Curated annotation (Swiss-Prot):
Its cofactor is Mg(2+). It comes from Mycobacterium tuberculosis (strain CDC 1551 / Oshkosh). The lineage of its organism: Bacteria, Bacillati, Actinomycetota, Actinomycetes, Mycobacteriales. Its EC number is 2.7.8.7. Keywords: Cytoplasm, Fatty acid biosynthesis, Fatty acid metabolism, Lipid biosynthesis, Lipid metabolism, Magnesium, Metal-binding, Transferase. This is Holo-[acyl-carrier-protein] synthase. Mg(2+) binds at D9, E58. It catalyses: apo-[ACP] + CoA = holo-[ACP] + adenosine 3',5'-bisphosphate + H(+). NCBIfam families: pantethn_trn, PRK00070.3-1. One of its GO terms (molecular function) is holo-[acyl-carrier-protein] synthase activity. The keyword Lipid metabolism applies. It is found in: Cytoplasm. One of its GO terms (cellular component) is cytoplasm. Pfam families: ACPS (PF01648). The gene is acpS. It comes from the Bacteria.
């Protein structure tokens, strides 16, 4: 297997929380029901968990876009809902894809890591193909 893309995203928790509270925000539609349920089940800050997941979605998009260097984009920009960050019973994250992006990345393994420090969250995504 070889690495075909690497993406990273860094987000400010206060800025994100402010945007989530704005009327008409797209963030409610960005997260899957499972992601919203996980966020409400955690004892940490409500904005913290979705923020790391948002960063992971952005990191996956950046990794995939980077793997298509000098090629025209083939997916719409509003694909965040098709990228779901799920966790196992120990909280380890994994990416589950649906829709068109799942078809494009069918043979790709996605590795993802999330982190929080102070008022910042970050995620790294690595795409690996056979």
């Amino acid at each position: 297997m070889g690495i075909v893309g690497v993406g990273i995203d860094l987000v400010s928790i206060p800025d994100f929380a402010e945007q989530v509270d704005q009327p008409g925000t797209v963030f409610a539609e960005t997260f899957t029901p499972g992601e919203r349920r996980d966020a409400s089940d955690k004892s940490s800050s409500a904005a913290r968990l979705p923020l790391a997941r948002w960063a992971a979605k952005e990191a996956v998009i950046k990794a995939w876009s980077g793997s298509r260097f000098a090629q025209r984009p083939v997916l719409p920009e509003d694909i965040h809902r098709d990228i779901e960050v799920v966790t196992d019973m120990w909280g380890r994250p994994r990416v589950r894809l649906t829709g068109a992006i799942a078809e494009y990345l069918a043979d790709v393994t996605i590795h993802v890591s999330l982190t929080h420090e102070g008022d910042t969250a970050a995620a790294v995504a690595i795409l690996e193909a056979p």
